[in-house]
């Protein structure tokens, strides 16, 4: 869209779609949220699951971990950027920095747990679900979790607006919701 390409339907993060709405690139009233995902904390399969039930327990778990993997914030990945800010907010960024490991660009932090390079990994739950050899401990507690909402909308210049609207309607059905749940997304 930014480069002048056209599309019949847009599926983006809610923020990304809202930015296009402000630029009048989305047909008014055509947008709808359909799923969301949060971050997941993972350990190697069979390892004891640390306590992450409260902000303080989560903080202590991070401080006690020998090594932690998360997406490199410099690459712009939402979970890595959010987690780096969370470490600063919790006042432990300096303590965590020496034991931080980042996967290669487009890599998955959970793979570093499987390989033994990291004891814990934090990344979007649907992404870590795809890696065998890890167990999901759960989401970070409360506002220490980054919830991403996914939205769909019809481009203002769509040549197939009726088809796009039908697909958006389908994205909100129980059938679609079952697929989201199986992939670690939550229907909204």
Question: Which residues fall in each region the model found?
Answer:
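Exported/periplasmic ABC-transporter solute-binding proteins
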Residues: 2-8, 13-37, 43-188
């Amino acid at each position: 869209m930014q480069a002048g390409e056209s599309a019949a339907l847009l599926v983006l993060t809610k923020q990304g779609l809202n930015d296009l709405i402000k630029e009048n690139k989305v047909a008014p009233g055509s947008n709808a949220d359909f799923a969301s995902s949060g971050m997941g904390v993972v350990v190697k399969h069979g390892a004891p699951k640390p306590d992450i039930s409260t902000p303080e327990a989560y903080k202590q778990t991070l401080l006690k971990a020998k090594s932690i993997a998360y997406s490199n914030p410099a690459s712009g990945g939402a979970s890595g950027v959010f987690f780096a800010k969370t470490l600063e907010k919790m006042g432990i960024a300096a303590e965590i920095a020496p034991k931080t490991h980042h996967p290669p660009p487009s890599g998955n932090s959970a793979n570093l747990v499987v390989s033994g390079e990291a004891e814990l990994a934090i990344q979007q739950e649907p992404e870590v679900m795809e890696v065998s050899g890890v167990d999901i401990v759960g989401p970070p507690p409360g506002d220490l979790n980054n919830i991403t909402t996914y939205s769909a909308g019809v481009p203002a210049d769509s040549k197939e607006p009726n088809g796009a609207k039908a697909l958006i309607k389908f994205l909100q059905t129980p059938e679609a919701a079952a697929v989201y749940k199986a992939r670690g997304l939550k229907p909204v």
